[in-house]
Amino acid sequence: MKKFLIFQKKYPKFIYKSYSLNLKPPKLSFEFFYSIPQDFSFVSKFEIQNLPRKSFDREILEDLVFHLGLVEMLNYWKATFSKEIEIEARKLDQREIKFFKTLIFKGMGEYFFQNRIPLSFAKKIKIKYQSGSKKAKKVKLFPKNAILPIGGGKDSIVLAELLKDAKMKLFGFTLNPQKNQLLTLNTLPLTKKIIIKREIDPGLLKLNQAGFLNGHVPFSALLAFLSLILAYIFEAKYIAFGFERSADDPNLKYQGVFINHQWSKSFEFERLFFVFSRKFLLKDIYPFSFLRPLFEIQIGKLFALFPKYHHIFLSCNKPFKINPKVQTWCKTCPKCLFTFVILYPFLGKEVFDIFGENLFEKKELLGLAKSFLDPRVPKPFECLGTKKEIHSAFFLAQKRWNEESSNKKLPYLLNYFKNNFFLGEKQEERMSKKLLFSLGKSNIPSKFLSYLAKKLCLRS
């Protein structure tokens, strides 16, 4: 019997039992209680710091927290892939169920693929709940206020710096920040800096070690629902994400369905979340991704405009997994090579200082380079750009190397690109310009769009 069937048969039900909320400004703490009968129970804990000292409608706050718990539960449910999820914590409108089923099916596609779970089984997951009518609450939200999720990478830096030009009050938050994320948070032009602590139940980690099912969950969806809580608390009309056009690009096809590591960053998710949050939670909220029209290579181009961040940002996730105290680039993972490749055309040899060496010379990265460039090879499960823009980044890197290097011999990976994927100067120039000076579809309010277009033209 397949592994997932063994767990599903032994643990047919997962329960979202309840939640608790403790509001004592300047802190808000809440806990989610989950169980897998008969053997396991879990408590997931959150604490939001730096809250304003004011009163809140507890019913609204509880509803927002409860909905966050629906996303958080996926971290625990994935251990057994129980075929029934029972929601005891609060009533749900039957129209909400469609959203959460979509979140499970598409947001956890990578998990299904990695655990070889047939998608027909994923579609059969049942959500049992108490039905209740629901509509969004109308609350005071100011159009000058915006909530920004802040990571340690280039996207949130570009996001905040561009929105600064729009004279917005920016409320930036970071979840369980590491050293470089705190440094970024404290350097950004933010009106308010918010720290959120999250504590995963240690029992889940024990299940992972014991060989229970594990895999990717839609983390950006968790940030989206956290943002709703903060939007209510800080009276912000806008939630501005740093999700880009490249996030729509899938990694591979599994049983006839495209699997996208970044689905909860995709435009599809953004639109679903926009409609869901305005229909069922906060009537006048406006979540959108300010970087949606841009490819990753365009964001790299904009990031080059902000030198004070060049040596403090960190997009590599590997150090955090191995030793959280080590804050540096591993220089071996897909994120490191990708970031290096898209920044070199705009920063040149400064990238060598950022990474500590020239990654184009590392022969051991050839396999990664192939997965980036070869259309026949699946793209790694990471937050990366499209193969087309990585191709153009390699071309622009080759061009810059030839322009500024006294050593005309191309480094190993650039030479590999030239010998295997180079399409000729004219075609490469045409392709790269098309990528660098285009804007894709978005849900950006029109008053913000001009700031994006203007900044892109500064380095044309």
Which residue ranges define each predicted feature?
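Contiguous, well-ordered alpha-helical segments that form the cores/surfaces of helical PPI scaffolds
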Residues: 157-161, 221-229, 301, 335-342
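RNA-binding accessory domains that recognize and position tRNA/RNA substrates
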Residues: 1-145, 157, 162-182, 186-203, ...
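ATP-dependent adenylate-handling ligase core
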Residues: 53, 173-311, 315
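ATP/NTP-dependent adenylation/nucleotidyl-transfer catalytic domains that generate, transfer
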Residues: 2-32, 283, 290, 304-460
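Short helix-capping/linker segments at secondary-structure and domain boundaries
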Residues: 76-87, 114, 231-239, 344-354, ...
